Structures are given as structure tokens and as C-alpha cells.
Regions:
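Chalcogenol-based redox active-site neighborhoods
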Residues: 1-105
Length: 105
């Protein structure tokens, strides 16, 4: 488990829309990294829409929002398009990053 002040483990994962997202490449921005179980489920949809609705405030605070689940990039692309999401959606299909962050989604 990560402790307060501990550096978050770096990762590179495929993301919605193609390409990859690397945590360390986001510097010097702050990163809001949220883990969620599954695309297009009621709670996860509400969460992603909420982050998208507040994206301007995160951007103004020099922060980037990354949602991470075990869904495939293809599922992320459908989820993003269906709800016009503005956050980055990273695919941890093997669960390696979830394991390093000691979270189960």
C-alpha cells in the first residue's frame, strides 16, 4: 500500500483513442488517478461523467485526470464516445498496475 508522500509507481498503459499514457510523462502536472471496476456501469459512469464535468477546474489547477480499469481500449473507446468523456481512460487488462497500487477493480 502506498503511504502519504510516497512516489506513485510509474506505469505506461494503452489508452482510449490509441497510443499510451505514462504516469511520469505527466509531470509537472498533478495527476488525479482513479481506479474503477468496469466501463458503462451505473457507478463508474457517474464517476467518469463527474470528473469530465469538472475537467476545466482540474485543468486550471494544472492537473490531469486518468481513469484506470481492466477494460480493453476498445471498451474504453465506446464508453468515452457514449458519454462524451473528457478524461483519459487507461487499460490495465492484465491488472499489473492495479496490483502494484494494491487495488482490485
Amino acid at each position: 500500500m502506498l503511504e502519504t508522500g510516497q512516489t506513485a509507481p510509474d506505469f505506461t498503459l494503452p489508452r482510449d483513442g490509441g497510443g499510451d499514457v505514462t504516469l511520469s510523462a505527466q509531470r509537472p502536472k498533478a495527476v488525479v488517478l482513479y481506479f474503477y471496476p468496469k466501463d458503462d456501469t451505473p457507478g463508474c459512469t457517474k464517476e467518469a461523467i463527474g470528473f469530465t464535468e469538472h475537467l476545466d477546474a482540474f485543468t486550471a489547477a494544472n492537473a490531469v485526470v486518468i481513469g484506470l480499469s481492466k477494460d480493453t481500449v476498445a471498451k474504453h473507446d465506446k464508453f468515452r464516445a457514449k458519454y462524451d468523456l473528457g478524461v483519459i481512460l487507461a487499460s490495465d487488462a492484465e491488472g499489473d498496475v492495479c496490483e502494484r497500487y494494491d487495488t482490485w477493480v
